[in-house]
Amino acid sequence: MLRYPADVSPFMAVPADPTPQDWANALSLIGAGHAIVFAPSPLTPSIPAVSQGLGLVQMVARDVTGALDPEVEQLTYADVPEILALTALTKPGPFLDRTIELGNYYGLRSDGHLVAMAGERMRAPGWTEISAICTAPEHRGKGLSVRLIRTLVHHINDRGEQVFLHAVESNPAIGLYESLGFEVRRRLVGTSLSAPT
């Protein structure tokens, strides 16, 4: 049973075929908060306070061209308040106070304000996930996300790693990702676990 620190990410890993004791251990790790577990099919935890059914696709970059962009800046801890405001507005997925510690995050600004961002989240040997791809509503349709994705692909590929991402099945950005050269690798289901109140 593994999970990220609660202020970094809500994600948790459980064994492929969890036992009741595994679920009890999961609850003890969750504490008073919540966690999200991803699996190829819905899980049926033997614990209370479970929310099922977040369908996701996992996509891999099969033929995505990376490129550096002189206007894209690397974000730092000093940018976290702006990052949290942008992610609260756009809801690209969980972004918490310390999520920036998971990898490199990049942004684009307009009149000094952060208006688009994306970064690195989960890692597996030879692979890095692109996450938190978001653009403020008034700046959508300008290709900002594409520029950020290409920047991340460049940096990740430059390290000799492959790129993947996750998206909610209903996310219209999936079409954009496919147009850039991403392919659906598999479907997943997210299960949210909360400690009983």
What are these regions (language model features)?
Residues 43-48, 146, 169-186:
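Conserved active-site alpha-helix within GNAT-family acetyltransferase domains
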Residues 1-68:
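Acyl-donor-binding surface of acyltransferase catalytic domains
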Residues 51-61, 183-197:
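Conserved catalytic-core motifs of GNAT/GCN5-like acyltransferases
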Residues 20-25, 135, 141-158, 174-179:
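Conserved acetyl-CoA-binding loop-helix of GNAT-fold acetyltransferases
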